[in-house]
Structure formats: structure tokens, C-alpha cells
UniProtKB/Swiss-Prot annotation:
Expressed by the skin dorsal glands. The modification Pyrrolidone carboxylic acid is found at residue 1. Isoform 2.1Y4 differs from isoform 2.1 in not being sulfated. This is Caerulein-2.1/2.1Y4. Its main location: secreted. One of its GO terms (biological process) is regulation of blood pressure. It comes from the Eukaryota. Hypotensive neuropeptide. GO terms for cellular component: extracellular region. The keyword Secreted applies. The modification Phenylalanine amide is found at residue 11.
Length: 11
């Protein structure tokens, strides 16, 4: 499953 990278690229 997805983590905090592919689902939230807001760095």
C-alpha cells in the first residue's frame, strides 16, 4: 500500500 510519499508529495 501507499505511504506518505506517493499520496502526499508536499515537501
Amino acid at each position: 500500500q501507499q505511504d506518505y510519499t506517493g499520496a502526499h508529495m508536499d515537501f
